[in-house]
Regions:
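Conserved N-terminal beta-strand and adjoining loop/helix that marks the start
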Residues: 1-20
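Active-site-adjacent beta-strand/loop module that shapes the phosphate/pyrophosphate-binding cleft
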Residues: 2, 15, 73-99, 104-106, ...
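Short, well-ordered beta-strand micro-motif
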Residues: 9-11, 23, 84-88
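Conserved Nudix-box catalytic region and its N-terminal flanking loop in Nudix hydrolases
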Residues: 16-58
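A generic structural signal for short hydrophobic patches within well-formed alpha-helices
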Residues: 41, 113-114, 125
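A short coil-to-beta-strand element that immediately follows conserved catalytic motifs
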Residues: 63-72
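Charged phosphate-binding loop/patch that engages nucleotide di/tri-phosphates or the phosphate backbone
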Residues: 117-134
Length: 134
């Protein structure tokens, strides 16, 4: 079974909570939804949090700090399982397209994120808000 791991890094922006999202590059993905920075484990990589950290650095150029697990979802079409980890973005975080895999990487206000994020990943936003309130 395929699996991916990624991060949902957040910060306080001028208009409230913002989250770091990326958009896949290429014509095929032009109209596709945004995503949390994520990817599949490398050969021999069995620590999903380490995978999430590596992918965030590789795709968005941001080094994740302290993280908590947000659980997983399973894509209905591909049956791929996505594991997410959340944490505050480092103060100096300056997202950039650090890989050919993405054409945009930026902090997005959470209300906008709900509209542009892959529909099956939106639950991670809800879980993040629950963790921050609890």
């Amino acid at each position: 079974m395929k699996q991916s791991a990624g991060t949902l890094l957040y910060r306080d922006g001028p208009d409230g909570l913002e989250v770091l999202l990326v958009h896949a590059s290429g014509n095929y993905n032009r109209k596709k939804p945004w995503s949390i920075p994520k990817g599949e484990p490398d050969e021999g990589e069995d620590d999903l949090e380490a995978t999430a950290r590596r992918e965030t650095l590789e795709e968005a150029g941001v080094q994740a700090g302290e993280l908590i697990a947000l659980g997983s979802i399973r894509y209905s079409k591909s049956k791929k399982t996505i594991y997410a980890f959340a944490g505050p973005a480092p103060a100096e975080a300056a997202p950039r397209c650090a890989s050919w895999e993405v054409d945009q990487a930026r902090f997005v206000p959470i209300d906008e994120a709900r509209k542009i994020l892959h529909p099956e990943q939106v639950v991670f936003l809800d879980r993040l808000l629950q963790c921050r309130m609890g």
